[in-house]
UniProtKB/Swiss-Prot annotation:
GO terms for molecular function: dTTP diphosphatase activity; UTP diphosphatase activity. Its cofactor is a divalent metal cation. It catalyses: dTTP + H2O = dTMP + diphosphate + H(+); UTP + H2O = UMP + diphosphate + H(+). Keywords: Cytoplasm, Hydrolase, Nucleotide metabolism. Nucleoside triphosphate pyrophosphatase that hydrolyzes dTTP and UTP. May have a dual role in cell division arrest and in preventing the incorporation of modified nucleotides into cellular nucleic acids. The active site is at D79. It is found in: Cytoplasm. The record marks R15, T80, Q163 as: Important for substrate specificity. Its main location: cytoplasm. This is dTTP/UTP pyrophosphatase. Gene3D superfamilies: 3.90.950.10. One of its GO terms (cellular component) is cytoplasm.
Length: 207
C-alpha cells in the first residue's frame, strides 16, 4: 500500500487483528510465529509474556526479511498471559484445562499481562508490558459446565474470552479492557506512533 510504511502483524489471532482494525489500522500481512508458549520452570507471568512476545517478533522477523515486499516493514507481536498470583494459567485446549481455569478464577481477582513487541524498519526492538486486574463473580457448576460446553474458551489464555459469554462473569476491571482481549490499543498505537508509523492514515475512510 502506497503512502505509508508497511505493517506486519506476527499473529494469527482474529482478536488482535480485529482490535487493530478497530483503531483504523490495517496490517499489510499476517505472519503468525510458531513459538513454544510453555512457561519455563519457575517463570513469573510478566517475564513469560515479555519473553514470548520477543520470541514471536524474532521468529516472524526471519520470515519477513526473506520477503522483498515486506522487508523494512514495521512488525508487531504480542503475547497474553493470565495469572492468579504467580501461577500462569494455560491457553486452554482441553475441557479439563478450561474447567480447572474457571474454578481457579471463580470469585477471585486475577491479572492479565500482555507484552507488545514492535520491530522498527531499522531493526530496533521496542517493548511494553501492560497489566489489567480482573475480578470474576463466583461461578456455579452450571456456569462452568455451560461455558465449557460453549467451546468459546478454546485456545484462550486463562480459558475464557472476555469479549464473549465470559464477559458476564466479570465483576470488575482495573486497567485496559483491550489488554484482556489480547492487544492493549492505547499502548500499541502509542508505540507505533512514537516510532513514526502513521496511525491515523486509515481514519479518513473508517466510516
Amino acid at each position: 500500500m502506497l503512502g505509508r510504511p508497511k505493517l506486519v502483524l506476527a499473529s494469527g489471532s482474529p482478536r488482535r487483528l480485529a482490535l487493530l482494525n478497530q483503531a483504523g489500522i490495517e496490517p499489510d500481512a499476517l505472519r503468525p510465529a510458531d513459538v513454544d508458549e510453555t512457561p519455563t520452570k519457575g517463570e513469573l507471568p510478566r517475564a513469560c509474556a515479555n519473553r514470548l512476545a520477543r520470541a514471536k517478533a524474532e521468529a516472524a522477523l526471519k520470515s519477513v526479511q526473506l520477503d522483498d515486499d515486506l522487508r523494512g516493514a514495521f512488525l508487531l507481536a504480542a503475547d497474553t498471559v493470565v495469572a492468579v498470583g504467580r501461577r500462569i494459567l494455560p491457553k486452554a485446549e482441553l475441557v479439563d484445562e478450561a474447567s480447572q481455569c474457571l474454578r481457579l478464577l471463580s470469585g477471585r481477582n486475577h491479572r492479565v499481562y500482555t507484552a507488545v513487541c514492535l520491530v522498527t524498519p531499522k531493526g530496533s526492538f521496542r517493548q511494553r508490558l501492560i497489566e489489567t486486574k480482573v475480578r470474576f463473580k463466583r461461578l456455579s457448576e452450571e456456569d462452568i459446565d455451560g461455558y465449557v460446553a460453549s467451546g468459546e474458551w478454546r485456545g484462550k489464555a486463562g480459558g475464557y474470552a472476555v469479549q464473549g459469554i465470559a464477559g458476564s462473569f466479570v465483576v470488575k476491571i482495573v486497567g485496559s479492557y483491550t489488554n484482556i482481549v489480547g492487544l492493549p490499543l492505547y499502548e500499541t498505537t502509542s508505540l507505533l506512533g512514537g516510532e513514526g508509523y502513521p496511525i491515523r492514515f486509515g481514519w479518513l475512510n473508517a466510516s
